[in-house]
């Protein structure tokens, strides 16, 4: 099942997502994760957080660019270096906008997998960018909040148009 992506202006994208309880992790939950993966690939994304499909839970899925898929539940991210990297980011929830964001180059990612088992791994370079971007969604933060003031001014009109379209669609569906 492919979910509809929530766009900039939707309230769910500004909320702090709730933790997943261990008791919630079952076959139905794993099917939900598979549907998230399908949605991510169908929309040409490299990551997708649950709030982006209207589910305020601490879950994201991502592909490291080499075909290695992760299904991440209740993530904790710890920077492992002060060295940063700047990477041009985009977001399925903020279509058509790509801007450079500076983030730690290497992080420790702790999470539960789709079976409720604890996983710890080091994410570097591109994967570090992806997991930090997706984790921000779980805290109600979009990448456009992390760009320079000048870059924000340059995209203000595009953002206003996305928000206006989101509001129009929401009103049509009510």
From Swiss-Prot:
Keywords: Hydrolase, Iron, Metal-binding, Protein biosynthesis. GO terms for molecular function: metal ion binding; peptide deformylase activity. It catalyses: N-terminal N-formyl-L-methionyl-[peptide] + H2O = N-terminal L-methionyl-[peptide] + formate. The active site is at 134. SUPFAM superfamilies: Peptide deformylase (SSF56420). Fe cation binds at residues 91, 133, 137. The keyword Iron applies. It holds the Pfam family Pep_deformylase. Its cofactor is Fe(2+). Its EC number is 3.5.1.88. Binds 1 Fe(2+) ion. It is an enzyme of class 3 (hydrolase). The keyword Iron applies. One of its GO terms (biological process) is translation. Belongs to the polypeptide deformylase family. PANTHER family: PEPTIDE DEFORMYLASE. Removes the formyl group from the N-terminal Met of newly synthesized proteins. Requires at least a dipeptide for an efficient rate of reaction. N-terminal L-methionine is a prerequisite for activity but the enzyme has broad specificity at other positions. This is Peptide deformylase. It comes from Fusobacterium nucleatum subsp. nucleatum (strain ATCC 25586 / DSM 15643 / BCRC 10681 / CIP 101130 / JCM 8532 / KCTC 2640 / LMG 13131 / VPI 4355). The gene is def.
């Amino acid at each position: 099942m492919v979910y509809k992506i929530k766009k900039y202006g939707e309230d769910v994208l500004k909320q702090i997502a709730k933790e997943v309880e261990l008791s919630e992790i079952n076959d139905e939950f794993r099917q939900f994760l598979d549907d998230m993966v399908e949605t991510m690939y169908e929309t040409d994304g490299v990551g997708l957080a649950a709030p982006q499909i209207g589910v305020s839970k601490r879950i994201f899925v991502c592909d490291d660019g080499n075909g290695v898929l992760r299904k991440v539940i209740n993530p904790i991210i710890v920077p492992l270096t002060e060295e940063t990297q700047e990477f041009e980011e985009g977001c399925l929830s903020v279509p058509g906008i790509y801007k450079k964001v500076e983030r730690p180059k290497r992080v420790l990612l702790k999470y539960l997998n789709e079976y409720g088992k604890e996983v710890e791994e080091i994410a570097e370079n591109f994967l570090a960018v992806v997991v930090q971007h997706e984790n921000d969604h779980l805290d109600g933060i979009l990448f456009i909040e992390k760009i320079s003031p000048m870059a924000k001014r340059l995209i203000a009109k595009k953002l206003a148009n996305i928000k206006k379209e989101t509001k129009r669609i929401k009103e049509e569906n009510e």
